[in-house]
Design a protein with these regions (language model features):
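Extracellular/surface-associated beta-sandwich interaction domains
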Residues: 22-810
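Bacterial Sec-dependent N-terminal signal peptides
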Residues: 1-25, 733-736
């Protein structure tokens, strides 16, 4: 996790230089690098991905999360906690040509550089300084902005067809975002680049990007893409960073290897959510081989350096079936260390799910799933009836340790190209195979030198012995091996395969974080597996998520020992005028007439313990407590979701709403601190935090777990806001205080909920309300028998009017 310092930097760099001249290493060759290169400078752009409960630093230079040139990282989760879970990550790619010459690109801490920005030419995989510099940026889009642009454009099309003014009425001040206008949809064909570069939706199908024709960066806002059969790459996530890299911009000073000629179109993306997905980020790499040579024994890997709070007390492990590699703490307390802030008691686990890797070599059949000949361990496309669409999953999982911490030098950081390639293939730096047990090294007395393995520390997730030549082994984790916790790194690798010129592959990974409140650190790994299953389901659904009703805008008026909370929905909200409805394509039922639409049902407002509480933690009473709930007055009150329990291995009922069923309200008086002990009255000048969400309801069929005719019923009738109309759901702060100083000393005599006296000037009827005249009107009627303009008592008039904001009365 930590970068090499002082003289160690110099030593490692010298070993890099020496490796340039190495002729043979094992079964392949490394030749001296050709000094001719494009002369590109190292990329410098850095952007924070921080839509949800994670703050992640993303670079255009090829690695992730590490603060450039510092022994510090920025993969902070929970966001605003000051605690980081990971240090850095990068792609490792390597293979040999027909002459056994190794070609490889990799990165760790950018002590050297193997990746640069910009596309390559299609023929000779060429680039230049100007091209690299031009693309040293993240092209950032949000699904909200793209959806709004599409709605604006289609409103204009509708106006032209029908002579209406919908566009100007619904979007009076709309401006097309610059990213839509300047989207890098096309490469420079004069330099031999691919005409089609960044993915875009071609509205009129003319093959050219023009936003004035309705084209836009291709977020699948209509949710029509079928990723199981469509190989094209769209943009994913509520927010997306897109950029393009290559490994031909200059000499490989990280590994010393010859370049491959790889063009890499990268994405980093995230979703705002109200569940475990709120603690995740995702990364997709489309890899196009622009090189002219076929590479054999090719491996693609994803390297991750963990820093789970204190980086010096971590363990690693993997879940073979899930394709998941993870870090967890070596004991039940994660303290502060060397400037790194720890998680404390019951520390979390963090993992990387290797969703998809490169395509398996074509063999003319649809490979199945299992351990037989040509069958897969994990991955996608196996046994789906489609020939030659199989993609590797995690085929190897390996770890190594920080060079500076006294570890076996053969199990430490790579220092030359052969080390990187050995790790990708499943060998230690000295060329010995990984073996099962102990530390995985052949001389370890607790390791079995007769059992080579592909997956280090799989626990009990490899019951068929996929990683041990079909011979099942006993449970093996770092805990069971009693290893010394250390500063770990791991690599998830896929291969071998043949990489041909022009071949297009994808690597997609998801970073998952979870925390158990139990003391044993491995309990957080179990929680991580549950969270990872949601990440896997999201990937398998093409990263399509239900939007859910947007959270309302929450405003707070501060009064003496009182806060007034008001809710509203802006015009760009999918719940404007409380009109949210959304079709759920994932509802599976044999009933063709089943109602598959969620509709707006109500609001919930929570008091939060502090600003660190995210929307995914609202069910934790130590962090969030329900202040108020209101819902449509109908036959729906209590709403139950059936949620899977790993402990019980069954779906259990969880009450999400106990509805008051009295109708929708938009303003609320709060005088009570739900986290206070003793006197619960709000205290002036104290900070309080609130968060509001909307929720929708669908119950196409009652779910009954013990009724075989009802097990296809609705398990999740309650669907809560996962985001706002723009961006994440954010808490609001309120500080009660005397309001007079902010209004020039004016005293306010009306309070929240008060109704004014109403005088009838004209009209008739009671508005379906109980009416009462004031005393003056009654006395006039008794004296004169008639009152031309009667005045009604407070709150007893024919019109229902109440004071919502006492400070906003004229």
């Amino acid at each position: 996790m930590l970068m090499f310092r002082s003289i160690l930097f110099f030593t490692v760099f010298i070993s890099f230089l020496n490796s340039f001249g190495q002729v043979y290493d094992g079964t392949y060759k490394i030749k001296k690098q050709n000094p001719k290169a494009a002369g590109c400078a190292p990329p410098t752009t850095t952007t924070y991905l921080e839509l949800n409960n994670v703050r992640a630093m993303v670079h255009t230079a090829g690695n992730l999360w590490q603060v450039p040139n510092q022994n510090y990282s920025q993969y902070e989760v929970p966001k605003n906690s000051g605690i980081n879970a990971l240090f850095t990550a990068a792609l490792w790619l390597g293979g040999t040509d027909a002459n056994n010459q190794l070609k490889l690109a990799a990165l760790r801490y950018r002590n050297g550089q193997d990746y640069w920005t910009g596309p390559l030419s299609k023929v000779q995989a060429e680039t230049n300084y100007e091209n690299c510099n031009k693309y040293d940026k993240h092209f950032i889009t949000t699904q909200d902005a793209i959806r709004e642009f599409n709605a604006w454009y289609e409103a204009g099309v509708n106006d032209q067809q029908n002579g209406t003014n919908t566009q100007s009425e619904l979007f009076p001040d709309y401006r097309v975002p610059d990213i839509v206008k300047t989207w890098p949809a096309h490469g420079d064909v004069s330099q031999g680049q691919d005409y089609y570069l960044a993915p875009f939706y071609d509205y009129n199908g003319d093959g050219n990007y023009n936003w004035q024709d309705g084209d836009f960066p291709w977020h699948d806002i209509k949710k029509t893409k079928e990723c199981s059969v469509d190989r094209s790459v769209s943009l994913y996530g509520d927010i997306n960073f897109w950029w393009v890299m290559n490994d031909r911009g200059n000499i490989h000073s990280e590994t010393g290897a010859d370049p491959i000629g790889m063009e890499i179109r990268a994405q980093a993306f995230a979703f705002a959510s109200n569940d475990e997905i709120n603690n995740m980020t995702f990364y997709n790499y489309e890899l196009i081989n622009r090189g002219t040579q076929t590479l054999y024994n090719t491996y693609f890997g994803f390297f991750t350096d963990g820093a789970l709070g204190d980086p010096y007390d971590d363990y690693v492990g993997c879940d073979v079936n899930r394709g998941l590699g993870y870090y967890y703490n070596g004991d039940n307390y994660d303290g502060d260390n060397s400037g790194f802030k720890g998680y404390g008691y019951a520390p979390p686990a963090v993992g990387v799910d290797f969703f998809e890797g490169p395509y398996q070599d074509n063999d003319g059949i649809d490979n199945a799933f299992g351990i037989g000949h040509d069958e897969a361990l994990n991955g996608i496309g196996y046994g789906d009836g489609i020939i030659d669409n199989e993609r590797f999953g995690m085929r190897r999982f390996l770890y190594y340790s920080n060079t500076t911490n006294g570890a076996n030098p053969n199990q430490t950081d790579p220092v030359n190209a052969s080390d990187y390639y050995n790790y990708l293939r499943g060998f230690w730096k000295d060329g010995t195979k990984f073996v099962y047990g102990g530390s995985g090294y052949i001389s370890d007395p607790d390791a079995n030198p007769l059992v080579p393995c592909d997956f280090m520390f799989p626990g009990n997730t490899d019951p068929l012995g996929w990683g041990t030549n079909g011979v099942p082994q006993s449970n093996w984790t770092e805990q069971t091996a009693n290893n010394t916790p250390n500063d770990r790194r791991f690599v998830q690798s896929a291969g071998p395969f043949v990489l041909k010129p022009g071949a297009v592959n994808n690597i997609t990974v998801g970073v998952v974080w979870a925390r158990s409140q139990n003391g044993d650190p491995f309990e957080s790994v179990e929680a991580l597996r549950t969270a990872n299953d949601k990440a896997q389901a999201l990937f398998e659904n093409c990263f399509k998520v239900l939007d859910a009703p947007h959270a309302p805008e929450l405003q707070i008026q501060e009064l003496n020992n009182e806060l007034i909370l008001t809710l509203s929905n802006p015009v760009n909200s999918n719940n404007y005028n409380e009109g949210y409805e959304e079709y759920d394509p994932f509802i599976a039922t044999a009933d063709p007439n089943a109602d598959k639409t969620y509709n707006f049902q109500g609001y919930q407002i929570f008091q939060l313990k502090d600003t660190k509480v995210s929307v995914s933690e609202l069910s934790d009473p130590t962090k969030a407590r329900l202040v108020v709930q209101c819902d449509i007055k109908d036959d729906v009150s209590k709403i139950i979701n059936f949620e899977f329990s790993d402990e019980l291995n069954a779906s259990i009922p969880v009450q999400r709403v106990n509805g008051e069923n009295k109708g929708i309200r938009h303003s609320f008086s709060v005088k009570t601190d739900l986290f206070a002990q003793g006197n619960m009255q709000l205290v002036n000048f104290k900070r309080y935090y609130y968060l509001a969400i909307a929720y929708a309801y669908n119950n196409y069929k009652n779910y009954t777990p013990d009724d075989p005719t009802a097990i296809d019923g609705q398990k999740k009738s309650y669907l809560a806001s996962r985001k706002a109309a723009i961006g994440e759901v954010k808490p609001m702060e309120g500080i009660p205080h005397f309001p007079q100083p902010e209004s020039g000393g004016t005293v306010f005599n009306l309070s929240y909920g008060s109704s004014p006296q109403i005088t009838r000037i004209d009209g008739y009827g009671n508005g379906n309300r109980s009416l009462e005249f004031d005393d003056a009107t009654l006395n006039s009627i008794l004296a004169n028998g008639y009152m031309e303009n009667p005045t009604y008592d407070y709150g007893k008039g024919p019109i229902n009017i109440k004071v919502v904001d006492p400070l906003n009365l004229a």
